[in-house]
Amino acid sequence: MIKQQIEELRQLLRHHEYQYHVLDNPQIPDSEYDRLFHQLKALEQQYPEYASENSPTQRVGAKPLSNFAQVKHDIPMLSLDNAFSDEDFFAFVKRIQDRLIHVHHSLTFCCEPKLDGLAVSILYINGQLVQAATRGDGTTGEDITANIRTIRNIPLQLLTDNPPTRLEVRGEVFMSQAGFEKLNKTALAKGEKTFANPRNAAAGSLRQLDPKITGQRPLMLNAYGIGIAEGVELPDTHFARLQWLKSIGIPVNNEIQLCHGIEKVLDFYRTIKQKRSSLGYDIDGTVLKINDIDLQQQLGFISKAPRWAIAYKFPAQEELTILNNVEFQVGRTGAITPVAKLEPVFVAGVTVSNATLHNGDEIARLDIAIGDTVIVRRAGDVIPQIIGVLHERRPENAKSIIFPTNCPVCDSVISKIEGEAVARCTGGLICAAQRKEALKHFVSRKAMDIDGIGAKLIEQLVERELVHTPADLFKLDQVTLMRLERMGAKSAENALASLAKAKKTTLARFIFALGIREVGETTALNLATHFKTLEAFENATFEQLQKVQDVGEVVAKRIRSFWSEPHNVAVVKDLIAQGIHWDNVEVKEVRDNPLKGKTVVLTGTLTKMGRSEAKEYLLQLGCKVSGSVSSKTDFVIAGESAGSKLTKATELGINILSENEFLALLA
């Protein structure tokens, strides 16, 4: 009897939460909801044997965390490409039409406001909320389950009698403008720090280690899509899927529309742009998605984004300010970037005091001088940049901006390759500015993987002039390391052990670690597999380099430029002298095998070897390794938790190999 009463109260409260938070249709006064809530809470305290973690009373109350655990996304949470004009949008549509030449009807889009919040993934197992994570880098996020459970419009249990066995909801967590203003008002009254804008407030609230604090913040969710779905037959359009989510208790934005044809899509964009200030929450554009799921799957993905969706951003907010000075920064590859030092100005929710001027060509194009009144905007509402100059306001004491001829850090000559806008320092690894970033790249996980040497340690080593080249890292001793801040005997021992371990590597990792421009992890692997030895790679001609898979004229020029610098050659020789070595890449003719000459895609997690090792084996089998599935793909090797690539391969009828079947080919 009591158990039934408790469950009925829970169902009643869930119903009213859904009516209030999702449908915006409250059916009872807040006071009545509070009465029911406290009645349930009292019964649960009196009868703890009937407690449930998914009860409406359990949204707040988990213990504070010491840190956030990592969560790997089974299906990557990709970002979106951007459009900033009608022309950009038309180009996006043309790319779609070029790929869908068999589709003769006009395209239908699901159009949504682009909320300015944080992307999250929420996993339901048999209808129960079991895990939530941030987007993170798209592959791995942070576990924020306890905090997500405190958000009132997110159901802890799906409102359906027949829930999917597994459902991953993806959406945006945000804060309304009214909630933001109230939060800041309360903070001011308490003498606490305020937030600059609703997005920062939402981010700070969602990443609180104490869920009780998150529970006091006015956060909301709007779902925009589905990741994993098992035990359910989903509708075949994006719009219908969002409506289905809404029917089972997941909040969806009320402004979403189905638009048939390009003009209707542009009408939606213009309408939302006009309504922007009256929506009650921050948006920075619209998201435009092909509605038909089958067409989405045919279009597929590029490396970081779907081909079937685009974010059409609103024009960035702009303000006037004064250019006080220009400083020239040096990046890891020697790129010289002019940075405008501005009179601080509030733009799009943040105070801007620096802005990029990109390069010397941009300075000339703008005809900008120190002392000018300039128009600054946050491109995409993120990166501040100067887009114009009010020349009529130029003061008499304005000073011309002189692009340096020598590096501001090491005084080496600055050069500019014909056809490139970027000027670069020629100092290579003798330039301290490049040195820090080059060393950080050298020790990184995908390069030499020296986990005992972190970014802060490298900064100390460079600033104290203890390390000038990567080879100097291997000359460090315990006494030297212990003189550095926060380096005791144990830390020094760990660092030296990491360095010793890193001396055994692979040719591919070593090439990648050198930081040659345009030579990424995959290209380094292709180079190592093709040339077999460092000597052959070093002496390869421009023409020989272009015979390597994925190496064109530009990459070949970068490689030859690297080896033509005596300083770089000296550093490489020193590294070898310090004991860097690797197993020989066997020079043997590719034996006949089912994968020879085929295009292969890896997906999922391999349990018996790393992804890089698997790529290396595939190249040795004479394969071309691709990062995406298409009609040109011959085989897909599927490890654990294989996601969208496996799904697409199945739909296209592509041959799929398990990890064990792949290993059998290597035997």
UniProtKB/Swiss-Prot annotation:
Pfam families membership: BRCT, DNA_ligase_aden, DNA_ligase_OB, DNA_ligase_ZBD, HHH_2, HHH_5, Nlig-Ia
Top EC class, one word: ligase
One term of GO molecular function: metal ion binding
Active-site annotation: 114
Disulfide bond positions: none
Any one cellular-component term (Gene Ontology): cytosol
Assigned EC number: 6.5.1.2
Chain sites annotated for binding Zn(2+): 407, 410, 425, 431
Binding-site positions, NAD(+): 30-34, 79-80, 112, 135, 172, 289, 313
Cofactor(s) listed: Mg(2+); Mn(2+)
Every BRCT domain range: 590-667
Catalytic activity: NAD(+) + (deoxyribonucleotide)n-3'-hydroxyl + 5'-phospho-(deoxyribonucleotide)m = (deoxyribonucleotide)n+m + AMP + beta-nicotinamide D-nucleotide
Single biological process term from Gene Ontology: DNA replication
Keywords in alphabetical order: DNA damage, DNA repair, DNA replication, Ligase, Magnesium, Manganese, Metal-binding, NAD, Zinc
PANTHER family per the UniProt record, alphabetical: CHROMOSOME TRANSMISSION FIDELITY FACTOR 18, DNA LIGASE
Family, similarity comment: Belongs to the NAD-dependent DNA ligase family. LigA subfamily.
Task of the protein: DNA ligase that catalyzes the formation of phosphodiester linkages between 5'-phosphoryl and 3'-hydroxyl groups in double-stranded DNA using NAD as a coenzyme and as the energy source for the reaction. It is essential for DNA replication and repair of damaged DNA.
Name of the protein this chain belongs to: DNA ligase
Organism encoding this protein: Histophilus somni (strain 2336)
